[in-house]
């Protein structure tokens, strides 16, 4: 059936059918997007055959793998996702490692449970003809382990360690120990699926046993280190994920010294075809390429202003001035830098910037929709680390010669609904006001702001693209990254030419909004002196004493992009005069003072009970049960979801601020989330198997 099946152009003004072998649309020239998806459930391997077209849309390319031949159309989604599927949705903040649910194919027979759920992984390795390089989408960790460098191998293990606690909280950590689920997508560790933990959930001893099997084919200069590390894990001497992460961080810093990194940065901005003035801003200054040698720390920022009476332009420029001043990009040679230390620096700078804009709003008596604010994306590199920070819906993409991954998750209503487990992402973005922001810089106090700062490891040539939605809307990056940005990595174009080409593309293909772009091009070469093998005892001695002084409590933790979702007001419905980029007030954390007050109250209550007991007087008051916290209702139809009840009421957040220059609601993210690793779980997180399903 391949010979007669066509691939639809994703350009909404074209939608022409094309041969499956085409790379570009024959009619409009748009690069054709090939989305390969994984069908959940082993039963589909025998029920559907290669070459078969399912639901007049999904072409079976391999057992359990289909190609979406109509990528411009929204996939089907149920009114309410089944409860077992919510694990994937709630793990959206970890989309670089865990697949997201693309959609589903309803059962052809209502009497049988034969619904097919589809998973997407971002960029999949393809050959020049657009066909799969690996017959099961991605290679297993074991398949490619022996071919990787020492730094890449430590990098993969570090990613597994970082995922341990988040997956443990969801009772799917056994996924990391399943060799068939633990896959690799270039530099990223990705899970093919999630699998449920058994009654006896795995612990770090099991992780140590899994890693022991990798030692014989590990890079020679990390084998001794891994032997000692796995022995400590299996013996139980190393029993905390944070200690394991710290040791691997030390190893990353050590082996990262075996490479030198230089950077080129280029920024550009344009008003667009439909706007009268430009409310975007960026850093460094536009239209001049900047080269940074090894040891210099690059900083790039893009802001997209929001607010009436030219307030957005003021907010964006104020953010650029403050952040570039607060963050010191000077070299840090001969200074010992601890892992994640710059995360705190960046987050603090973002909070300072937020309060300066908020105070400006208050000084100018800006209320409700006249308050000004701005989105933010920022990239800052230190040694082998790239820190990616964001607030709002501007985006960062991580591009290599073979992959493009969206690093950030938009701070909008659509993403919020997904993280709450209510809607599939590609369904959520179809709703009115789906692109309304849930937070932006300057709308209220920094106490209500939750910036996301992620730490990425650079071990190969790559490009970080920072952009406002003037470029990213309508999946333009997903369509054009390979043809427009990869030539930079091949040495066929320079960074200036690529930046100018992307800006021109934004105006030609979108043009509805201001467009701003920052390119951070990183070149990686071997260091003049190779690194010596790391001695495990050295890493442990340097790291563990510091960690033993800390008491870790993960009960209230949030992770990159994961928000406290108990106080997000819902904006009013969109109207002809209200932009989709309305910005509701930010999230609210419980004040530390409230926590202290509660603790003091509990201690006082215990003291009173003790006194009554000693006095032989029975307690006169009944036990106190806290009232349950009301959760938000699922979004259905076109009605925005009800706001979640704040557990700490008392402050009324300001009304949403609207961008006075109406834009368009962004479509699906340019790249779907990327998967991670796995273990042999007892039961996969899937729906029930169809009863005796057989093909006609």
Language model segments and positions:
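N-terminal sensory and localization modules of signal-transduction and trafficking proteins
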Residues: 14-16, 43-45, 51-54
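Long, intrinsically disordered low-complexity tandem-repeat segments
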Residues: 629-690
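Eukaryotic nuclear, charge-biased low-complexity tracts
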Residues: 55-56, 203-204
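Intrinsically disordered, low-complexity acidic Ser/Thr-rich regulatory segments
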Residues: 2-8, 26, 36-47
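PP2C/PPM-type serine/threonine phosphatase catalytic domain
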Residues: 4-6, 13, 20-32, 60-159, ...
């Amino acid at each position: 059936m391949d010979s007669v099946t066509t691939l639809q152009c994703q350009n909404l003004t074209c939608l022409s059918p094309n041969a499956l072998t085409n790379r570009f649309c024959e009619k409009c020239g748009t690069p054709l997007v090939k989305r390969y998806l994984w069908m959940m459930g082993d039963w589909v391997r025998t029920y559907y055959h290669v070459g078969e077209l399912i639901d007049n849309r999904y072409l079976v390319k391999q057992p359990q793998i289909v190609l979406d031949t109509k990528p411009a159309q929204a996939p089907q989604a149920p009114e309410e996702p089944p409860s077992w599927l919510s694990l994937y949705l709630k793990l959206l903040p970890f989309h670089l490692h865990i697949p997201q649910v693309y959609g589903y194919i309803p059962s052809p027979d209502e009497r049988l449970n034969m619904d097919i759920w589809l998973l997407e992984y971002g960029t999949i390795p393809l050959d020049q003809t657009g066909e799969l390089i690996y017959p099961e989408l991605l290679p297993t960790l074991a398949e490619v382990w022996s071919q990787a460098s020492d730094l890449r191998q430590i990098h993969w293990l570090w990613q597994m360690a970082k995922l341990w606690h988040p997956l443990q909280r969801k009772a799917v950590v056994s996924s990391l120990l399943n060799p068939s689920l633990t896959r690799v997508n270039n530099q990223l560790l990705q899970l093919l699926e999630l699998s449920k933990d058994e009654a006896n959930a795995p612990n770090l001893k099991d992780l140590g046993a899994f890693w022991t099997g990798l030692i014989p084919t590990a890079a020679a200069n990390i084998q001794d280190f891994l032997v000692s590390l796995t022995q400590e894990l299996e013996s139980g001497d190393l029993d905390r994920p944070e200690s394991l992460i710290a040791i691997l961080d030390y190893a990353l810093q050590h082996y990262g010294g075996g490479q030198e990194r230089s950077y080129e940065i280029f920024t550009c901005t344009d008003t667009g075809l439909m706007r009268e003035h430009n409310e975007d801003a960026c850093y460094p200054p536009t239209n001049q390429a900047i080269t940074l040698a090894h040891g210099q720390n690059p900083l790039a920022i893009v802001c997209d202003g929001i607010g009436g009476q030219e307030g957005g332009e003021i907010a964006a420029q104020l953010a650029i001035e403050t952040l570039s001043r607060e963050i010191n990009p000077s070299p840090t040679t001969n200074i010992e830098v601890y892992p994640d230390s710059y995360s705190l620096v960046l987050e603090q700078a973002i909070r300072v910037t937020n309060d300066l804009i908020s105070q400006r709003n208050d000084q100018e008596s800006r209320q409700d929709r006249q308050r000004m604010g701005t989105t933010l994306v920022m990239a800052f590199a230190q040694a082998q680390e790239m820190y990616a920070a964001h607030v709002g819906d501007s985006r960062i993409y991580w591009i290599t010669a073979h992959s493009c991954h969206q690093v950030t998750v938009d701070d909008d209503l659509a993403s919020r609904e997904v993280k709450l487990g209510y809607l599939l992402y590609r369904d959520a973005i179809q709703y009115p006001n789906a692109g309304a922001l849930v937070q932006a810089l300057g709308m209220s106090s920094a106490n209500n702001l939750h910036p996301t700062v992620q730490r990425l490891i650079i071990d190969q040539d790559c490009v970080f693209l920072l952009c406002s939605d003037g470029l990213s809307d309508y999946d333009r990056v997903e369509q054009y990254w390979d043809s427009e940005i990869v030539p930079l990595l091949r040495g066929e174009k320079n960074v200036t030419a690529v930046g100018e080409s992307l800006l021109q593309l934004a105006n030609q293909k979108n043009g509805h909004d201001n467009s701003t772009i920052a390119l951070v091009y990183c070149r990686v070469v071997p260091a003049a002196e190779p690194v010596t093998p790391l001695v495990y005892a050295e890493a442990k001695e340097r790291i563990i004493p510091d960690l033993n002084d800390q008491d870790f409590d993960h009960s209230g933790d949030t992770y990159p992009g994961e928000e406290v979702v108990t106080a997000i007001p819902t904006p009013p419905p969109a109207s002809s005069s209200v932009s989709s980029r309305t910005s509701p007030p930010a999230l609210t954390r419980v004040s530390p003072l409230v926590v202290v007050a509660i603790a003091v109250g509990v201690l006082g209550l215990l003291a009173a009970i003790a006194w009554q007991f000693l006095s032989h007087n029975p307690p006169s008051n009944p036990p106190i049960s806290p009232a349950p916290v009301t959760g938000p209702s699922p979004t259905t139809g076109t009605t925005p979801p009800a706001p979640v009840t704040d557990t700490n009421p008392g402050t009324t957040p300001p009304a949403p601020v609207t961008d006075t220059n109406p834009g368009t609601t962004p479509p699906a993210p340019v790249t779907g989330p990327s998967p991670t690793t796995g273990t042999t779980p007892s039961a996969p997180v899937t729906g029930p198997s169809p009863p005796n399903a057989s093909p006609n």
